[in-house]
Each structure stands twice: as C-alpha cells, then as structure tokens.
Amino acid sequence: MQNEIKKVCVIGAGVMGSGIAALIANSSHQVVLLDILDKDSNDPNKIVKNSVKNLHKQKLSPLSFPDKVNFITIGNLEHDLDLIKECNLVIEVIVEKLEIKHQLYNKIIPYLKEDAIIASNTSTLPLKKLKVNLPNNIKSRFVITHFFNPPRYMELVELIIDHTIKDEVIEKVSVFLTKMLGKTIIKCNDTPGFIANRVGCFLLELVVHKAIAQNLNFVTIDQIFSRCLGLPNTGIFGLYDLIGHDVMKLISSSLISALPKSDDYHRIYTNTKVFDKMIEHNLIGRKGEGGFYRLSVSNGKKIKEVINISDLSYHPVQKVDISFNSLNELLSSNSIYGKFFSEIITEFYIYLTSLVPSVTNNIYDIDTTMKLGYSWHYGPFELLTIAVKNGWNLIIKNADLMNIPLPKYLASKEYQKIDKQKFNSKKDFLQESKIVLSNDSANLIHYCENLVFVITTKMNSLNHNVFYLLQEAVSKAENYGKNLYIYPQGNNFSAGADLKLILSYIQDGNFHNLENLLKLGQQTMRYLKYSSVHIISCARGVALGGGCELLLNSSYIVANQELNAGLIELGVGLIPGWTGVTEMFARSNGNKTKLIRNIKNIIEQNKTSSADYFKADYGIKNMQVNMNKHYILDDALKLRISKKIVSIPNKITLPKINIVSEIDTSKYNELQNKVLNKFQNIIDKHNEISEAELLTYEREMFLELAKTPQTIEKLQAIVG
C-alpha cells in the first residue's frame, strides 16, 4: 500500500461535502466532487456546479484563496464514476440513511483502486452497519471520518475504526488528516454518537428539558454556563439554535433508537411536545424564523429576543445579574440556579463517566473532543478536577442524595488516577530545551541543534526587551553560523506592539522615549532583514501590526494556512512604525500596481484571512504554507534553504502617480485621507528614496498621529 493520499473523491456536494472538498483543495490536493445527476436540467452537473459557486459566496469562506477552487474537479454519479479510479481516498457525505449509503457503496466499489480507502462522514450511523454487506477486502479499508462544520475552521475529526481495519489504513488516513488537512484526530469506538454527539447532545438535551420543566430563565442559564463553566457565549440555548432544532431532533432520535433502554438518554429525552410545536412553526433556530432566541430589527437596530415557551412569543433579552463568579460559588449556593446547576452537573458527570470505557477508555480524548468540537475552555474532566474544590467527591455526594447509582468509574475511584499534567497539551519548549539567552519578555533556546527565539509576553506583544534580546539572538546565530527561528508561544505569532506601553508614553508626554522605541524597533527589523543568516518565522494565529512587520523582515516564513496577518495600525490611529511603511514602499520599487496595493494594505488595515491571501496581498515570496499549526516548527526545521546572500539597502524608485485617482476613497474617513496625503507627499517629493529617509518619514508620521486626541481615544478604548 502506498504511504500517501494524493487524490481524494468526495461524494455529496451539500454544505458539508463541498466544505470538505474545499478543505482538501486548500491543502493543494486534487479532489473530485460528485453528486447525483440533475435530471431537471440540461446540465447534468448543475447540482455540483452550484455547490462550488456557493463556496465563493459564504461569509466564512471554505476556500483559503479563490484559485484553490481549481483543485476541484466536478462530476455526477452517472457519467463520471471513472474519476474515482484515480483516487486514494473516497469520502462519502450523503444523506444519513443506511439503505441509500449501501446503494452508493455497491455502485462505486467496481471503480475503486485496489488500495483505495472509503470513509463515511456520518455522525449518527454505526460503522458495523455501514460496512455489514461489504466484501472483506473493502471492510478492512472502510472507516468513519466525522468532520465538524465548517470543516475548514473546526480542528476536530473523529476517526471511528474497528479490529478489522488494517493498521496501514489507519496510519495512512491519520497522517492525511493531521499533516495534510491540519486536523486533530480522536480515535473513537464504534458506539452511537461517538464522543462529541453522545456527550455534547446529552448535556444540551438535559439542560434544555430540565430548564423548560422548571420554567427557568434561558438567558441566565446561558450566561452562567459561559462565565462559570467556560462554555462559549452561545451557552446551551444559543448552541441549540445554532445547530438547529430539526438537526438536534434528528441526532437525538437517532441516538435513542440506537441506545439500550437502560441508557439515561432515554430518561432525559421524553417530553418533546414543545420542541415539535416550535419545529411546526419553523422556530428551528438561526436558519429558521427564530429559536430560543431571535434577532429582530426595530428602528434600524438589531434587538436580541428570547422566546416565551408558553405561547411562542418573543420579548427583548433583559440584562441579568449573575452573582456567581466561579463554579465553586455556584455549586455551594442554595439559590434556584445553584440547585439547578448542582443537579445538572451531577447528572451530566454520572452519564459522562458511565461512557468509560465503552465509548473510549481515554478520558483526555473526551476533554480534547469537547474543547475542539464544542469550543469549551475546559474539558469536562479537567473542569471538575481543577476548577471545583473536591469536585469528584461532590458528584458522589450529590448522586447519593439524588439516589443515583454510581457508574463503575466513580465507584472504583478511577478519577484518583487522573494526571493533571495531561490537561496541558501545549508542548513546553522552555522545559525541554536549553535556554541560551533570556529576559522577562523572551527566550533564545537551543532546540534540536537549532536556535529558536520565543517571545513570552502576553499575546507575544513587542516591547524593548523583546527587541534587545532579538538583536542578541541574531548576533548569536550569526556567530554560530546557524539560522534563527522565531516561534510563537501559544496560538498566536504576535498581536503587535505593547499598546499599553505606547499609551503610557503618550499620556505622560514622553515622546522622546516613544521615538526611541520606534528607532529600536526599526533597528531590530533591519537586523533581521540584513543578517548574514536566515531568519525563519513560524507564523500561526495572528501576526498583526508589529507582528506582521516581523514577518515582512524575515527571509523565510512558514505560515499556517489560517494565519490572520496585516498592518492594522490605522485602527488605533497610528501607522506601521517598525518598517511597515518602509517595506510597503520598498516592495513596490517603482511598480505602480504594487505600490497602490501596498498603500491600500495600510490605509484599509488589510488583515488577511489566510496564509494564501497574505502571500498574495503583501507580496510575500519566500513562504511555505503549513496546514497543521502544531507542526509548524517541525516543518520549518525541515526546510532546505541555501546559504543566505546578504543584500544591501538600495535606493527605492517611486512611480509618479496620483494615489487618489487610483483608489476609491469615497468611504475613507478623515484619518485615512490624512495618511494618504502624507504618502502622496513622499511620492511627489522623490523620484528615488533611501530606506533611511523612509524610516524617518515613518517615525515622524507615527509621532504626529500619536499626539492627536483621536488616537489617544482609540488606544484607551483598546487598552481599557
């Protein structure tokens, strides 16, 4: 069996199927997208064509860049089955009906490559039922890959396997999902709902049914879940609306039909009359006319409303006073909501622990699933172990009071074996590696025979000490003759300048120190650009303002596909002051089109939505796109780059243009027009300009803007 999946076929061009196809295209892999024949049209591929067109229209774009669509080949299941012969992996994403899936499998089997893998994206059907009628040689190559919607943005994929599947198949799929598509995979047993739906939907149904029965305030419950338990702001009722009441009914009904009568899901999912009535009135959530919440418009303003379950009327959401600041306070309260949450949490953890080991014997996988699949801040085991005082004993005590028998996991005190260190999944390079240089804002470490610079400030913001140590790090790398890697602590490369520091200088009238900070930053960026060794930046998350300037001065970038980067300083009333303006002029070097594009990047605060857009919009030449942010340093260390040819600053040619006549400024504000005029003055005064002159202009403009009340107001609003 070959080790690599080179081409994929996705069958089913609905929202999920087309999203998976787009994800694969984003990784620059060829993908075939097939769906049924449109018999009512002269175009047999109309269904798939419309689906692909829709990829460009969605608010959260499934495509990382428009031309990625060229990796998608379309067809239908009548005329184009031969396209399957070229594919190493076939992902089925069709309706959740077993009979229809079986019909499809029988249809495509004759066209499969000898070692091709079949995967179903089902979220409700068991693996054993999907493959029951398949030939043995196909069964050993059949898995479930449960992607989450939207596939591009949700990191989790549940991989469902059994003992009949070959190890090389599991390895091949796992490598493709993680390295090529950037996913974190959780291997699940073949049980109803796998992990995410079994755990997440149980909690949703438990809370919603119990709250309705007790006539409690939905808004209060959602805010408590968000504040005290670390759930997203949608809470429970908001998430129910987001998923869709019709979809929740489908999932829960499927679970009920598959689970034994003894399973607690049967007990909590009983009285559904209210839900059925809401569905009848198209109150199915965000995609309907409303749900538990809805947005209405009054006098041009959007108003969030909450439903009155008794008559399905709506009224504006009122601000609620939450007196609990922690989960411990909540659970120790004798209030209505204190008692409600004590019952909810007890019932939830009784159910959760009853799933070990049948659903999975790895509790840390459950935590990862809930954090990635449902965006919880804590996994459920992490929450009870770390955030609640004597949490496990509390559950056992409450279970006794509620006369609920303990599952084996609790009765045998398995929770005592929980390793708290495993809840921190981040790889700590500082612990693993030798520190070469260090201060309170950054470290230079020796990792795998390489020099890695790690910023340690909040959001990796930039200040004096970061720049001082970075200059030392460059010198150290040059002395060793080694490339220097800039790697982010946490999920973000750098959010830019320490705005609190900048605001303090402005408020104190200390513009001398502010100018020195600008000079230090500019000097450091020039150190990077003109160093004798390569500066290789590993960028993920955000690289904004000064963080973007770090990238612009690196000789090579390994950027995660989901990178958000850009020169956004104008949003706080400033301009890029650490060579950002200089770089935008230098990178155009006489090219009118490039100069206009680069000026617009600054004026319009262009924050790109992907690494592909950053490469195109900011004219980045030496960049490799990485799909999995967790492997970004590994990918950087594998680069084979020839020895750096050190360049020297040259004069920059400026084309003679009138920027205003080239750019639509009709929607520009006073600040944008002011900065545009400053740039025009530079163009009018010079045919050629040196970097040193541009850097001086850059500092002068920055300091001038820093003294305006508007800038101070913007900075105060952000810093707080």
From Swiss-Prot:
It catalyses: a (3S)-3-hydroxyacyl-CoA + NAD(+) = a 3-oxoacyl-CoA + NADH + H(+); a (3S)-3-hydroxyacyl-CoA = a (2E)-enoyl-CoA + H2O; a 4-saturated-(3S)-3-hydroxyacyl-CoA = a (3E)-enoyl-CoA + H2O; a (3Z)-enoyl-CoA = a 4-saturated (2E)-enoyl-CoA. The keyword Lyase applies. PANTHER family: 3-HYDROXYACYL-COA DEHYDROGENASE FAMILY PROTEIN, 3-HYDROXYACYL-COA DEHYDROGENASE-RELATED. Residues 1-384 are annotated as: 3-hydroxyacyl-CoA dehydrogenase. InterPro entries: 3-OHacyl-CoA_DH_NAD-bd, 3HC_DH_C, 6-PGluconate_DH-like_C_sf, ClpP/crotonase-like_dom_sf, ECH_dom, NAD(P)-bd_dom_sf. Its EC number is 1.1.1.35, 4.2.1.17, 5.3.3.8. The lineage of its organism: Bacteria, Pseudomonadati, Pseudomonadota, Alphaproteobacteria, Rickettsiales. Residues 453-720 are annotated as: Enoyl-CoA hydratase/isomerase. One of its GO terms (molecular function) is enoyl-CoA hydratase activity. This is Putative fatty acid oxidation complex trifunctional enzyme. It comes from the Bacteria. Keywords: Fatty acid metabolism, Isomerase, Lipid metabolism, Lyase, Multifunctional enzyme, NAD, Oxidoreductase.
